[in-house]
Amino acid sequence: MSGKRPSVAQKRLMKEYKQFISDPPQGISAGPADEDNFLLWECLIQGPDDTPYEGGLFPATLKFPQDYPLSPPVMKFTCEMYHPNIYKDGTVCISILHAPGDDPNMYESASERWSPIQSVDKILLSVMSMLAEPNDESGANIDASKMWRDDQEQFVKIVRGTVRKALGL
Amino acid sequence: MNSDIPDPSDWIDSKLSGLKDVDETLRCHICKEFFTAPMITGCGHTFCSLCIQRYLTNTSQRCPTCMQEQQISQLRKNVTVETLVEHFSAQRATILRVVKEAAKQPIPEVVEPPSSPDLDDGRRRSGRKRTRTNYTETLVSSDDIQVECPVCQAMLPGAAINRHLDNNCNDTGANGGNWLGTKKKTKPLRKIQRVNQASESVANVRRKLQDEGLSTSGSKQTLFRRYDEWVTLWNANVDNKTPRSKSDIKDDLRRWETTVVANENAQPVKMTIKNIDDRQWVQKHKEDYDYLIEQARKSILKKKQEKEKEQQQQQEGHQKAVDRREDNEPDMKRSETEGYQVVS
């Protein structure tokens, strides 16, 4: 912890990590990329069953701000993802990751926003359910939103392609 | 490294796994530590004084748990929880050790002592009696109860509250000292007022910072934020049962400046292309560019020469190797690298 006393953010993330490994949610693994810097985590998310993402294993990073948990982390998939709520660069757009006050899409109620009582496992579970149920009201990837609404078959085809790519097939 | 961070999951594998919930309940949802100076919101949720004040000043004016509107002035001390935390955290390590040791040995079954109805009755009667005496005692000694001053939020005995208010919350006078001087010599810490950025002048904030012995350097924004954080840290300290010294709080403020503020400032300044007239820029830095180009050329040349030398050596080596072995795979690899170097 760079020799100094760990900050509030670091301390809280240590606890979250410890709790996470003692009781990990199904289909999710996560942890700090480097035990000296708890502000950057790497995670792996399993594609939920009965969705086009089934069978996939998607790597992502979670970047925490210095004032965590007052502000939320930023989550970014590091593999190619085709999903209405994921920007083309992999950044996840989901209400639990938006601080109350900033609302990029003007549709979220304050109750589903980030609050310090949320935690890493809740974020990752929300992302998993977002994979299962895209929200086409807030299009982060407009093409994917349209495709999901208008041509489900083609959407599934493209997603299956990214799943195979993520698995290196 | 994880074993030295106590957290609710410590109880999971023990015989008393139910204590995980107790442990969790006694922790602040924001920092996940046991409550320090717990404060209860108007909507009934409890947080550390520092955590909730920081959140309400910097992030949002809503309760983090239920999102109801919330203001710092609505916060009240949660004394029962504070005491609970104190007792539980003092016993925690012991309970955990005992429970974990017990997990290794089979626990003998607990036998309920037989209870006779007579005994029960007697107990109940004595219990009622005790309650009654307690009640009267409370009535008699109501002046000894600590009450919070509605103006400055200092805690003082009920008997002293009227005089305290008459003196405009100033108890440092010769007469006011008698209820203080008996036990502690330190005067009670007082909360300080927040400043409103819209109505307060910079000079005023600078003076306030100076009065507290804090740094007065930085922009207007920095000064206001520094004072704001100071108020948060200080007032949270006042809520503490055993307040820390002023220099400790100053250390906290310094740490906050070095982690949070320094990090914000470290974000790269966005340079827009509009700001730069590229022709002017090239002219101004022509010498630098020329120098860099020259350096780059030189280093490329040097690398090429080195690689050529290496290749020659390798070729010779390979020739020998190929002579010895029939496997010609390394030969192919070599031609690949050769091709790459021609391109560069």
UniProtKB/Swiss-Prot annotation, chain B:
Keyword Transmembrane assigned to the entry: answer is no
Start-end of Basic and acidic residues biased regions: 303-337
Name the UniProt record assigns to this protein: Postreplication repair E3 ubiquitin-protein ligase RAD18
Function in brief = E3 RING-finger protein, member of the UBC2/RAD6 epistasis group. Associates to the E2 ubiquitin conjugating enzyme UBC2/RAD6 to form the UBC2-RAD18 ubiquitin ligase complex involved in postreplicative repair (PRR) of damaged DNA.
Q: Which UniProt keywords apply?
A: DNA damage, DNA repair, DNA-binding, Metal-binding, Nucleus, Transferase, Ubl conjugation pathway, Zinc, Zinc-finger
Q: Where is this chain's protein located in or outside the cell?
A: Nucleus
Assembly notes: Interacts with E2 UBC2, forming a complex with ubiquitin ligase activity.
Q: Which family does it belong to?
A: Belongs to the RAD18 family.
**Gene3D superfamilies (UniProt xref):** Classic Zinc Finger (3.30.160.60), Zinc/RING finger domain, C3HC4 (zinc finger) (3.30.40.10)
GO terms (BP aspect): postreplication repair; protein monoubiquitination
State the Gene Ontology terms under molecular function. Answer: single-stranded DNA binding; ubiquitin protein ligase activity; zinc ion binding
Provide one Gene Ontology cellular component. Answer: Rad6-Rad18 complex
The primary gene name is RAD18
One Pfam family it belongs to: zf-C3HC4_2
Which residues take part in binding Zn(2+)?
Answer: 149, 152, 164, 169
Task: For the region Disordered, give the residue spans.
Answer: 107-132, 302-344
